[in-house]
Amino acid sequence: MVKNAFISVISQEENRGSVEFQVVIFTNKIRRLTSHLEFHRKDFLSQRGLRKILGKRQRLLSYLSKKDKVRYTELISQLDIRELTTR
């Protein structure tokens, strides 16, 4: 498990309450939990936590795509995650 594989996209002076910062933090947690679940497949509580964090990140990305499409596309490309699919 890689514990120190963090994404340093946001500068230190960035507002910690901003949507971009929160999405980066959630992405770090998701990648850490994913690597944990590769070794511990039956850890169902961690699977539940992963699903909750994925939902939170999806809601934040949806909000950002509605408010500022340019910042949304930049963040998606920096974090190397898939774009939201609309229903």
Swiss-Prot record:
* One MF term in the entry's GO annotations: structural constituent of ribosome
Q: Name one GO cellular component term.
A: ribonucleoprotein complex
Against InterPro entries, the record matches this protein to:
Ribosomal_uS15, Ribosomal_uS15_bac-type, uS15_NS1_RNA-bd_sf
User: Which Cys-Cys disulphide bridges does the record give?
Assistant: none
Pfam families, per the entry: Ribosomal_S15
Q: Which Gene3D superfamilies match?
A: S15/NS1, RNA-binding
Q: Which CDD domains match?
A: Ribosomal_S15p_S13e
Read off the SMART domains from this record: Ribosomal_S15
Its principal location? plastid
Q: What processes does the entry annotate via GO biological process terms?
A: translation
Q: Which UniProt keywords apply?
A: Chloroplast, Plastid, Ribonucleoprotein, Ribosomal protein
| Intracellular or extracellular location(s) | Plastid, Chloroplast
Please give the subunit comment from the record: Part of the 30S ribosomal subunit.
The family assignment reads: Belongs to the universal ribosomal protein uS15 family.
Concerning PANTHER family, the annotation shows: RIBOSOMAL PROTEIN S15, BACTERIAL AND ORGANELLAR, SMALL RIBOSOMAL SUBUNIT PROTEIN US15M
Name the UniProt record assigns to this protein:
Small ribosomal subunit protein uS15c
Per the UniProt record, the source organism is: Oenothera argillicola
